[in-house]
Amino acid sequence: DRTIWPKKGFSIYWNIPTHFCHNFGVYFKELKQFNIKYNSMNNFRGETISLFYDPGNFPSMVLLKNGTYEIRNEGVPQKGNLTIHLEQFTKELDEIYPKKIAGGIGVIHFHNWRPIFRRNVDNLKINKDISIDLVRKEHPKWDKSMIEKEASNRFETSAKIFMEKTLKLAKEIRKKTEWGYHGYPHCLSGSTDKPSFDCDALSMSENDKMSWLFNNQNVLLPSIYLKNVLKPDEKIHLVQERLKEAIRISKNFKHLPKVLPYWWYTYQDKESIFLTEADVKNTFKEILTNGADGIIIWGVSYELTDRKRCEKLKEYLMKILGPIAFKVTKAVKENTPLNF
């Protein structure tokens, strides 16, 4: 069973492409002294953790910088070619993640649509529009609700096939790796003008409908990214709610998939600003005490394009992130209270 405390283990992973910083003579060898797990040579993919951005050839409406969309593999899952996608996925893994380096955590990062029809909002709404259009053209006499229901069914059935087959293939061809999709379980709660962090009843029942995915995952990887604009108690509430839902889902399955939230060291709404020491402590503490199995520290390559930025991150690791990570892992290992 999942025990909150004492914990069997709690691992903090480094999933930031800091190998780019080697070009500027900035290295992150100190990760080890802070008990942070990383790949050898600081590679982005390897024996500890590997992230695959938009792998294979998922049917997608890819939003371009000029605001238009590029249609890939027929655009939406109900029109897409599964074979083309899986062949491309295998080829990519062979190129960038050969068996000899594979192990640890494997993360499929795909966000061009969500498998629950209703959740395709904002930039993803185009998936709903196209799906509805396809049915409307076939059945011009149907009323709006019939069209939407059919569009939703077709979309969700095909989306499930693409996500499930990809996951099963990944597990089959890289057996040593523990696989999961980035950003799930996900909650769509609250209107945009009034954010709510609670996972509402509808979101929870939709997540239960996704048991076909979670039952096949070795790890659940919800994302916990903070906004600077939030008040301190709102930030804590956000972390608690995201974790509560992931733990609830994990407990639904005999194999109790690990819960490893993705945590970004910058604010979502102010990417130039690193999280304050207080925010790091509060979020790490909440992640630990709410029952997660670890934390994945995430960052993106465009934050590491010059020496100055690399040095800024290195300093942040040395002064704030590293010491806090060390205290958290030490408290778990020694079964002592966390003193910040």
Swiss-Prot record:
Tell me the compartments it is located in: Secreted
Q: How is it modified after translation?
A: N-glycosylated on at least two Asn residues by identical heptasaccharide units composed of Man, GlcNAc, and Fuc residues in the molar ration of 3:2:2.
Disulfide bridge partners, by residue number: C21-C310, C187-C199
Any one GO molecular-function label of the UniProt entry: hyalurononglucosaminidase activity
User: At which residues is glycosylation annotated?
Assistant: N66, N81
Q: Which domain of life is it from?
A: Eukaryota
Example GO CC term: the record gives: extracellular region
Key words, A-Z: Allergen, Disulfide bond, Glycoprotein, Secreted
Question: Quick one: a GO biological-process term for this protein?
Answer: defense response
Q: What is its main location?
A: secreted
Q: In which tissues is it expressed?
A: Expressed by the venom gland.
On whether Secreted is a keyword of this UniProt record, the answer is yes
Give yes or no: UniProt keyword Disulfide bond: yes
Protein task = Has no hyaluronidase activity.
Which PANTHER family does the record associate with it?
HYALURONIDASE
Sequence similarity: Belongs to the glycosyl hydrolase 56 family.
Q: State the protein's name.
A: Inactive hyaluronidase B
Q: What's the source species for this entry? A: Vespula vulgaris (Yellow jacket)
